[in-house]
Amino acid sequence: MSTHTLEARNLVKDFTRRSGLKTSVLHAVKDVSFTIEAGKTVALVGESGSGKSTIARMLMKLETPSSGQILLDGKDSGMRGRAVEAYRSQVQMVFQDPFASLNPFHTIVHHLERPIRLHHPKLSSAQVRARAIELLERVRLSPGESFAERRPHELSGGQRQRVAIARALAPGARFIVADEPVSMLDVSIRLGVLNLLADLQREENLGVLYITHDLATARHFSDEIMVLYKGDVVERGPADDVILNPQHEYTKTLLGAAPEPENLGRLRDEVRAELAGR
């Protein structure tokens, strides 16, 4: 059986900047290539402005690459019409800000039913509702019916991000682009959301691109780490190898700038102990 893949091939993104009569070109992403396999998590690590979110936006068809290709299962994903619609049913995004990514005027169940209807038009209203409730319970918002008719302001930040994860799964996505999914949450609830993502990744055999500046979580939750610096991938490899034996000076700088480098391993031990105790 073939493995499903999401591939970025030689992605380049340039932005033209104007200042008065002068123009300049910002090379935001420079010839970046990688492949995400179903059931695997790849972390894209770098400081703000390194190009991480630009790559995410290109993968989600929110930005058009200056050059390069995005392939789903080895086929070009296209940029228009039904090709993009089919692509987006398979590739979904969890945005950074759970307070802005949900419409405050709509109920929680509406946020889930809409993509289900869009991508599965043959389902009856009852089937759509049942699928939405099932998704709420899959992300540990249980019982689902008790959350369905609430609005975003009635949920905590962590609960909202769980809804965002459920919405990403609603079309039947096989790949998730998670752009700093816990950076705006309280430290006390970050681990729970990341554990949920890890569980869903295993249970659903999802491919995940985990975008972060947090090396501790990148090490634990990823199979592979790519380090991005000014639009270039300067280092990549198995997560432990990159963290424990960094080769590039920028990776060493990121590790040196971590508030408590000794916690890079401790987080892994804590999470493993928690998962083992379930």
For the regions a protein language model found, what residue spans apply to each?
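Short catalytic/signature loops enriched in Gly
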Residues: 2-4, 18, 25, 142-146, ...
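ABC ATPase NBD coupling module
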Residues: 20-23, 77-92, 110, 118, ...
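Helix-to-loop junction immediately C-terminal to a conserved catalytic motif
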Residues: 60
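Conserved ABC transporter NBD signature motif
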Residues: 68-79
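Conserved ABC ATPase signature
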Residues: 151-155, 159
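A short, surface-exposed alpha-helical micro-motif characterized by mixed small hydrophobic
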Residues: 218-220
